[in-house]
């Protein structure tokens, strides 16, 4: 029962961790710049990987019958709909969520304080987390991930170069 509560708490925590770009305009200049915003579809991927892939066999069988199948669909559908280049950023985002959650569990800290931006300095994602995500997501979702994702550190992959959907939020300026 305690394990189920912890897994449910992890799923809830994962739904508020990844970033998606949106655009804001500085007042008076009308210039836009990209800012991070939660991206729910990648949260589902990290929750799926942590709850359904990394749990012991007996627990994963129980989850598979209920929520794992739904989480897999909610993860794979958006991943299949974005460009191959944007998938590299998505893989980094999922890896960073998992890394931050594991760090928070180790140190007993919350993952992200309310009102904090996701654009804190990017920490290097440990190789084992990145490898697990790169080995699992493409085959699980039947999508291709560019080869350079396996060799390029996440901290150097900027969302600005990829065709990640953006929305404009302009306060006092025109975008």
Swiss-Prot record:
Cite the post-translational modification comment. Contains 7 disulfide bonds.
* CDD domains per the UniProt record, alphabetical: AAI_SS
Residues annotated as signal peptide:
1-19
Matching entries from SMART domains are given as:
AAI
Family from the record = Belongs to the prolamin family.
Q: What does this protein do?
A: Seed storage protein. Not integrated in the gluten polymer through disulfide bonds, unless incorporated by reduction and reoxidation during dough making. Increases dough strength and bread volume, but decreases dough stability when added into a base wheat flour.
Report the protein name in the record.
Answer: Avenin-like a7
What's the source species for this entry? Triticum aestivum (Wheat)
């Amino acid at each position: 029962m305690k394990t189920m509560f912890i897994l449910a708490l992890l799923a809830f925590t994962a739904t508020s961790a990844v970033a998606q770009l949106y655009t804001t305009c500085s007042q008076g200049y009308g210039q836009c710049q990209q800012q991070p915003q939660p991206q729910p579809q990648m949260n589902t991927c990290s929750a799926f990987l942590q709850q359904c892939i990394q749990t012991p066999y007996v627990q994963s069988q129980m989850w598979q019958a209920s929520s794992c199948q739904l989480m897999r669909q909610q993860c794979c559908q958006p991943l299949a709909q974005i460009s191959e280049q944007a998938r590299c950023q998505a893989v980094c985002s999922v890896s960073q969520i998992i890394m931050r959650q594991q760090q928070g569990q180790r140190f007993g800290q919350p993952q992200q304080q309310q009102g904090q931006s996701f654009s804190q300095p990017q920490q290097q994602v440990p190789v084992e987390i990145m490898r697990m995500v790169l080995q699992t997501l493409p085959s699980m979702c039947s999508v291709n991930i560019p080869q350079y994702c396996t060799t390029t550190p996440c901290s150097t992959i900027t969302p600005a170069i990829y065709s990640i959907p953006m929305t404009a939020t302009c306060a006092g300026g025109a975008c």
